[in-house]
A protein has these predicted regions:
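Extracytoplasmic/secreted proteins, especially bacterial periplasmic and envelope-associated proteins
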Residues: 59-66, 70, 95, 99-102, ...
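Solvent-exposed loop/turn segments at secondary-structure junctions
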Residues: 54-58, 78, 85-89, 119-125, ...
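Active-site-proximal C-terminal subdomain of hydrolase catalytic domains
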Residues: 154, 159-238
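Structural recognition of the beta-strand scaffold that forms the well-ordered cores
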Residues: 47-51, 79-83, 113-118, 153-158, ...
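Boundary/activation segment at the start of structured domains
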Residues: 4, 18-110, 191-195, 248-255
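Bacterial N-terminal signal peptides
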Residues: 5-15
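A short, glycine/acidic-enriched catalytic loop
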Residues: 119-149
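Caspase-like cysteine protease fold
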Residues: 26-34, 39-41, 209-255
Length: 255
C-alpha cells in the first residue's frame, strides 16, 4: 500500500480502526459429505463474489478491483462485483443485503466459491453503507449453504471485528474462512488517504507467491503483523484463520 499521508497522521488515523461511525466440528444435522478432498479446481470453474461495503474510503473498492484483476489474470471468468460507490463502479451492482445474497446463491455450475468482503465492521457484521444494511454471519452462512453447498468455499472478511464470522456454523470442513481481525479487535488502513486496508494490501502482495489458500492465509497474517508493528499499532488486529479438513490443500485459482 502506498501511504499517502505523513507517518504520524497515518498512525493517528489507524488508532480508530475500520469500525463503522483451528478447526471446530460442524453443527450437528448438517450434511458435509464431499466426493473428494479437493486440491486443484480449474480457474474457470470458480465463482467469485467481491464486495466493497462502504464508500467513505477508496480502499474498499480499490481492494475488490485489484483482486478482480488478479483473479482474471489467473483465468477466473465468473466474477461478480458489488460496490457501495456506484459512481466509481457503475457497472457493479449495489452492495445491498439482497444483492449480496443473490450473488452468493447464484453459483450454478461452479466447482468452487470465493466470497471476499471488505468494509467497515461491527460486532454484528459487515457494514453495507449504500443500502444501510449489514451482512451478518448467519446470513452469509445461509447464502453460502444455498449457493455453494459442499463445494470448496473460501470466505475472506476484511473488516473490524470480522472474527465474529468464525461461528460454529461457518466452520465447515469444505470452507476456508479468513478474517482481518479477531472478534474483539479492529483492523486498520481504511482512511481517506489509504490505497488499501492493511489486510487487503497484504493479501494482494502475498497472492502471487502462494500456492494454496492456507499458505496465503499464513503469509497475509505475518505481513499484517509486520505492517502493524512498523506503524506503531499498539493493539494488533490479530487476523484469524480457519481451514476446514476437506480443503487443507485447496489451491489458489491458476496455481
Amino acid at each position: 500500500m502506498l501511504i499517502r499521508v505523513a507517518a504520524l497522521v497515518a498512525l493517528l488515523t489507524s488508532l480508530f480502526g475500520c469500525t463503522a461511525d483451528s478447526d471446530a466440528p460442524p453443527p450437528s444435522g448438517r450434511s458435509m459429505a464431499m466426493a473428494t478432498a479437493p486440491g486443484d479446481v480449474p480457474a474457470s470453474r470458480w465463482h467469485a463474489v467481491l464486495i466493497a461495503g462502504d464508500n467513505n474510503s477508496p480502499s474498499f473498492d480499490n481492494g475488490i478491483d485489484a483482486l478482480r484483476d488478479k483473479l482474471s489474470a489467473r483465468g477466473v471468468r465468473d466474477i461478480r462485483l458489488l460496490t457501495s460507490d456506484p459512481v466509481r463502479n457503475p457497472s457493479a451492482e449495489v452492495a445491498s443485503a439482497s444483492n449480496v445474497s443473490s450473488a452468493l446463491r447464484n453459483a450454478n455450475g461452479a466447482e468452487a466459491c470465493l466470497a471476499f468482503i471488505t468494509s467497515h465492521g461491527t460486532e454484528a457484521g459487515v457494514v453495507l453503507r449504500q443500502a444501510s444494511g449489514v451482512v451478518r454471519p448467519s446470513a452469509l452462512d445461509n447464502a453460502l449453504d444455498a449457493g455453494c453447498g459442499t463445494l470448496p468455499t473460501v470466505v475472506v472478511v476484511s473488516a473490524c471485528h470480522s472474527g465474529v464470522f468464525l461461528t460454529p456454523a461457518m466452520r465447515q470442513p469444505n470452507r476456508v474462512v479468513l478474517t482481518a481481525a479477531a472478534a474483539d479487535r479492529v483492523s486498520f488502513g481504511c482512511g481517506a488517504g489509504d490505497r488499501f486496508t492493511y489486510y487487503d494490501q497484504c493479501l494482494l502482495q502475498q497472492f502471487d507467491a502462494a500456492s494454496t489458500w492456507g499458505q496465503l492465509a499464513q503469509a497475509t497474517r505475518a505481513c499484517v503483523q509486520n505492517l502493524e508493528k512498523s506503524m506503531g499499532v499498539r493493539t494488533p488486529s490479530q487476523p484469524q484463520i480457519f481451514v476446514g479438513s476437506a480443503v487443507a490443500n485447496l489451491r489458489l485459482p491458476g496455481r
